[in-house]
């Protein structure tokens, strides 16, 4: 199995700790005036999502996590599982709702997602950075009602609620940033 030395640590690196796959969130190299240098690392458990702090001596080696990051197409959700398909092999996988988490509000059928697989099971599902979704419900914007920056909530076809400018109407197609949940612009269609 591949090993990573502490001097190879960087954000996003996948490692094994205590038999579980983790991803490095933050890495800080510390060289005290006295004593051995070390790495203070924040890691997220890919199975549970829990973030913990760990300290590694400088030069220590850690096993690489045998995880596969792949693009898959979201097919449908049956409430308990989100069904994904590999577009090349047409092989289907069922990701539990816990693996999808908050990404569920951005997933539309046929959308391509990044799926992290461990032991051939989906651990996490990340939506694309930008999605195009239709507005299904929003208050009508009243002309001249712009004091205070002007914005209103809009419910999208997946159930997500985003803040949009007053001129947005029901039925419009919007581009939304899934990382921040912010309105980016209209999609000309």
From Swiss-Prot:
It is found in: Cytoplasm. PANTHER family: ELONGATION FACTOR P, ELONGATION FACTOR P (EF-P) FAMILY PROTEIN. GO terms for molecular function: translation elongation factor activity. Involved in peptide bond synthesis. Alleviates ribosome stalling that occurs when 3 or more consecutive Pro residues or the sequence PPG is present in a protein, possibly by augmenting the peptidyl transferase activity of the ribosome. Modification of Lys-34 is required for alleviation. PROSITE patterns: EFP (PS01275). The modification N6-(3,6-diaminohexanoyl)-5-hydroxylysine is found at residue 34. This is Elongation factor P.
């Amino acid at each position: 199995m591949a090993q990573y030395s502490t001097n190879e640590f960087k954000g996003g690196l996948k490692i094994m700790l205590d038999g579980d796959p983790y991803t490095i969130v933050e890495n800080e190299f510390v060289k005290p005036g006295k004593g051995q240098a070390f790495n203070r690392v924040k890691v997220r458990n890919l199975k549970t999502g829990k973030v913990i702090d760990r300290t590694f001596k400088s030069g220590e080696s850690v096993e690489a996590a045998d995880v596969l990051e792949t693009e898959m197409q979201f097919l449908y959700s049956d409430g308990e599982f989100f069904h994904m398909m590999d577009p090349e092999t047409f092989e289907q996988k069922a990701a539990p709702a816990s693996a999808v988490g908050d990404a569920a509000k951005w997933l539309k059928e046929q959308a391509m997602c990044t799926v992290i697989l461990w032991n051939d099971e989906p651990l996490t599902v990340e939506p694309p950075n930008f999605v195009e979704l239709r507005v299904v419900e929003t208050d009508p914007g009243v002309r001249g009602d712009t004091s205070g920056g002007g914005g209103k909530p809009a419910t999208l076809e997946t159930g997500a609620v985003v803040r949009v400018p007053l001129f947005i109407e029901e039925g419009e197609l919007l581009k939304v940033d899934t990382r921040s949940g912010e309105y980016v612009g209209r999609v000309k269609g």
